[in-house]
Amino acid sequence: MQEHGFEEVPGSKLNYDMSVRYGISRDQVKKLIRIFNESAAIGFLPALRDSMYYVKRLHEELGYRFHCITSLSLDPNAQRLREMNLAKLFGPTAFERVVCLDTGAHKDDALEEYEGAGCVWVEDKPENAEAGFRVGLNCLLIEHGHNMHYYHDHVRIVKNWRGIYELITS
């Protein structure tokens, strides 16, 4: 955001709400997120922490296949860039399915088809982790600055993909 002229409000670095973090309207935030999500940058997102190593291990050594549900965009070019980025980072077969919802959309409806499946659901947004819990998924929340004080009886906080790997394989 700084490269586009937006300065962070002092003391707001850990706030998930970008309108608070940058002192701009929610409408402007939505527009900026959509612009970013539909840009070429989506094809070059870096992997989070140790995810490349542990996702590959889960997939290649243990046969896990991943489904990604992302509130990216309905734009087909953005969707394709995201799929290409995931394949580049994790290999061509780790992600069996990528579901792209509209920018900022809630994931409740998309998660309904997994109801009762008992799958592991990895999230970074507490509201989406809770949506996974409501349909019976085993919810893991990756810790970030914006969610590090979150607590829910049925959502386990993990610091990284090593923690996820250890939970799954123990």
For the regions a language model picked out, list residue spans one by one.
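Active-site neighborhood of HAD-like aspartate-dependent phosphohydrolases
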Residues: M1-Q28
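Anion (oxyanion) recognition and catalysis
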Residues: Q2, K56-E60, F133
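A structural signal for well-ordered alpha-helical scaffolds and beta->alpha junctions
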Residues: G11, L48-S51, A78-E83, G104, ...
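Short, basic/glycine-rich phosphate-binding loops at helix/coil junctions
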Residues: G23-E38, L62-H67, F90-T93
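Substrate-recognition "cap/lid" segment bordering the active-site pocket of phosphatases
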Residues: I69-V120, P126-A129
